[in-house]
Amino acid sequence: MASFSILSIFKIGVGPSSSHTIGPMEAGARFCESLKGILEQVVRVQITLHGSLALTGKGHLSDEAVLIGLHGIYANELEVTTKKALLHEALENKVLKLANQHHIPFDYAKDLIFDNKPLTRHQNALILKAFNSKNEVLKEETYYSVGGGFVYTEKELDNLSEEDGNESIAYDFSSAKELLELCQKHQKSIAEIVRLRENALKNHPDATMVKIYHAMLECYDNGANSKERYLPGSLKVTRLAPSIKTRLEKHPTSGKDPLALIDYISLYARAIAEENASGGKVVTAPTNGACAVVPSVLLYAKNHLFENLSQKAINDFLLTSAAIGYLYKKNASLSGAEAGCQAEIGVASSMAAGGLAHLCQATTQQVLIASEIAMEHHLGLTCDPVGGLVQIPCIERNVLGAIKAISASKLALEDEYKPKVSLDEVIATMYATGKDMNEKYKETSLGGLAKTLKC
């Protein structure tokens, strides 16, 4: 496997879920690639969604995602018109154009299985099988969607464990402590260390962050200016961002209310989270369910804190945030199905707090303190999406995650602030808490608000 890029914490894809939509779509597309040489022999495919993918798969559009992937399409390539046409062909006409080349019959009721029982390696798993005319299995693969749009086969998961101990990457780090030491040794900021690391891997950190930033802006614009009244699904949740935007344009907040800027943060976060919930184009940050926290804090900084924020400063914010997200991916989880919403909104808030602290001229130590504070006050947060949809409580959690990130950043900048808990310690605590959490509260829609609220 190629060396892990910190830049991949941010991925351009589609909503509503990175683990349940982007991941299954990638699994389907990769399975198509594995059929090269035997594609014409395939007469049927079977999809089995396991664990959380089965329990919340319909609300998260996992079923539709894997079907689109089996056409050889990845989430960053998908257009809305293409999506509608492919799903109509597969679900209404019962024909699947495998790898966008080979037509086979498809029966949703028989060929797509929802198995609530999780596999042992991760709560989000899917098994894909291809059969020939004799009903023999030509190819079978198990994929694990581990959060943030990252997908691995069984073999790749094994290789990940081996690489952790064997791989040597310039300017790499495995903990916040190591990151701090790197910054001090080279007299560089976190963003600069990430640049050095990614350049050593022949990646293009600044060009990539420009692309990510513009995708975030596009997502905000689409959500804030949507003409749709309701989000899709049975809950009939009203899109609130367009009306907030209209109100703020007509009646900008005055200086009388010291907390008036919260309305703008709500606008930014709701617009992006609502666009994600509608299945629109989004950026994982680090997941789709938490996609609005980082960009809404960035928009707050750009539009209200700093005049003429440069593209380099924006890139620095994103690279700093990505470094924090990388620590959670490496040492804990980005999956609500594995560790609850603390692994999604909590991580996003931690990332955004670190990024904002950097923009506010924080030291590296203060950046890490800000990230720690933000996570500390998300510990134990459950993932209980009502109806399996990424709407209630997910959208408003993005708003509050952004507000907490801003508060954490401000706290960390206090000269007399002396932390008792390190970022490494809170990351370990989050993961342990997630492992201890009852499965009902880990993206199964079997507990919490998902059970209390009847839809």
From Swiss-Prot:
<dbReference type="GO" id="GO:0006094">
    <property type="term" value="P:gluconeogenesis"/>
</dbReference>
<comment type="pathway">
    <text>Carbohydrate biosynthesis; gluconeogenesis.</text>
</comment>
<dbReference type="GO" id="GO:0051539">
    <property type="term" value="F:4 iron, 4 sulfur cluster binding"/>
</dbReference>
<dbReference type="GO" id="GO:0003941">
    <property type="term" value="F:L-serine ammonia-lyase activity"/>
</dbReference>
<keyword id="KW-0479">Metal-binding</keyword>
<dbReference type="InterPro" id="IPR005130">
    <property type="entry name" value="Ser_deHydtase-like_asu"/>
</dbReference>
<keyword id="KW-0408">Iron</keyword>
<dbReference type="Pfam" id="PF03315">
    <property type="entry name" value="SDH_beta"/>
</dbReference>
<dbReference type="InterPro" id="IPR051318">
    <property type="entry name" value="Fe-S_L-Ser"/>
</dbReference>
<dbReference type="InterPro" id="IPR029009">
    <property type="entry name" value="ASB_dom_sf"/>
</dbReference>
<protein>
    <recommendedName>
        <fullName>L-serine dehydratase</fullName>
        <ecNumber>4.3.1.17</ecNumber>
    </recommendedName>
</protein>
<dbReference type="InterPro" id="IPR004644">
    <property type="entry name" value="Fe-S_L-Ser_mono"/>
</dbReference>
<keyword id="KW-0004">4Fe-4S</keyword>
<keyword id="KW-0312">Gluconeogenesis</keyword>
<dbReference type="GO" id="GO:0046872">
    <property type="term" value="F:metal ion binding"/>
</dbReference>
<dbReference type="InterPro" id="IPR005131">
    <property type="entry name" value="Ser_deHydtase_bsu"/>
</dbReference>
<keyword id="KW-0456">Lyase</keyword>
<dbReference type="Pfam" id="PF03313">
    <property type="entry name" value="SDH_alpha"/>
</dbReference>
<keyword id="KW-0411">Iron-sulfur</keyword>
<comment type="similarity">
    <text>Belongs to the iron-sulfur dependent L-serine dehydratase family.</text>
</comment>
